[in-house]
């Protein structure tokens, strides 16, 4: 695996603004198209520009793997529709009181870990979507 150094909005905090699986790199609306293309080329993915909860904070707010995407309840219907239309992934809202799902849930295609502050009733839903 090759690793490159890459900045987002001229800052070091790449995980705040982007999210990646094997097929897509998700970047915020307004992200420079050439930077998105270069990033997608390097990662050998497609890029998709989208807001999450009408913000640029994709990495903080969304959690995904190659099966699905979980979004906070503050996400708009248009965002959900667009992600469903542009990907072949299962896209769902996790209706918990917490919105920083990317900070509270970490998954790959084989398993995951969930913060203890996530209510137990949501664990099965997380398993089903992802």
Task: Name the predicted role of every residue range.
Residues 1-130:
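The feature marks the mature, well-folded catalytic cores of soluble enzymes
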